[in-house]
Design a protein with these regions (language model features):
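Short glycine-rich or small-residue beta-strand-to-loop segments that form or flank ligand, phosphate
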Residues: 1-7, 23-26, 52-61, 68-71, ...
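Glycine-rich oxoanion-binding loops at beta->alpha junctions
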Residues: 19, 23-50, 197
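Short, acidic/small-residue loops that bind anionic groups at enzyme active sites
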Residues: 26-31, 75-100, 236-240
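Mixed-charge interfacial surface used for oligomerization/domain docking
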Residues: 120-224
Length: 283
């Protein structure tokens, strides 16, 4: 069984991915706040099977700590628990919320592919192996042109001028690496892909692309972005196997987007194509 979760405000993540072929449970904390160990523990108990439970955790200090505590509580109940930590963001190595890289939209690929593997009824270690394989092969980076406001804070997480953008943005409204003047979509995509392609060698591989809205970016703009992503990858000889465009992991009303690339092999392609039926994702 698969469980994931995190703060609210990222809808449809993570509750939208509960269903056939993906997650068995999702645990939501308050807005941009990790769920408590007790909440996660109750989720684990609700879905536990003889084969055990895999926790898919985004790499934020609170998430990792609380999920690990919940996992230990479940193990005391003799429930078999394993975990993977998603850290796909190439923009930042360490931030307010993290040690190391943040877990962002690439997490959805982990839900999909590990969920497909779990549907096969294999052992927990095999589901964990496949989930880790996705993490090892997925990279993401995002930008924002308008911040979001956490209700409890009452003000935006960072300030942006009318003609500015924040590069390397996180999914909790935390600032990115730097601000710079707003640029055309193609130039922004070039910068993002330069960072992603420098981090992992996609040459000669097929990839899955995810262009994800931060919450307030309309589909038309996402398709403009995706069009240039496809052009850049084609020029570099990287074949796009499948493309996902839409809202997969948002940040309240933030205006911006992220691009994720997943390097594929035959195993990952088959699992990506496998049947899934959830509110937010169907295959």
């Amino acid at each position: 069984a698969l469980i994931s979760g995190g703060g609210s405000g990222h809808e449809p993540a993570h509750g939208g991915y509960v269903g056939t072929g993906m997650l068995d449970a999702a645990v939501a904390g308050a807005v941009f706040t990790s769920p408590t160990p007790d909440q996660i523990y109750e989720g684990i108990k609700a879905i536990a099977t003889d084969k055990g439970v895999l926790m898919v955790i985004k790499n934020y200090t609170g998430d990792v700590m609380n999920f690990e505590m919940a996992g230990e509580m479940a193990q005391m109940d003799e429930i078999k628990v394993a975990q993977v930590v998603v850290n796909d963001d190439v923009a930042v190595d360490g931030s307010l919320y993290t040690v190391g890289r943040r877990g962002v939209a690439g997490t959805v690929f982990v839900h999909k592919i590990a969920g497909a593997k779990a549907e096969e009824g294999v052992e927990l270690e095999e589901v964990q192996r496949v989930a880790q394989k996705v993490i090892d092969n997925v990279r993401t980076m995002g930008v924002a042109i308008r911040p979001c406001t956490v209700p409890a804070a009452g003000k935006p997480g960072f300030e942006l001028g009318e003609d500015e953008m924040e590069v390397g943005i996180g999914i909790h409204g935390e600032p990115g690496t730097h601000k710079e003047p707003l640029r055309p979509a193609d130039e922004i995509v070039d910068h993002i892909l330069d960072k992603i392609l420098a981090d992992i060698d996609y040459t000669g591989h097929e990839v899955a692309v995810m262009v994800n809205s931060s919450g307030a970016t309309p589909l038309m703009e996402l398709f403009i972005i995706n069009n240039h992503v496809a052009d850049v990858l084609a020029a570099k000889g990287i074949k796009v196997y499948k493309t996902f465009v839409g809202e997969y992991m948002t940040s309240l009303e933030m205006e911006g987007f992220s691009v994720s690339l997943l390097r594929l092999d035959d195993e990952l392609k088959a699992l990506l194509d496998a049947h899934a039926d959830t509110i937010a994702f169907k295959a």
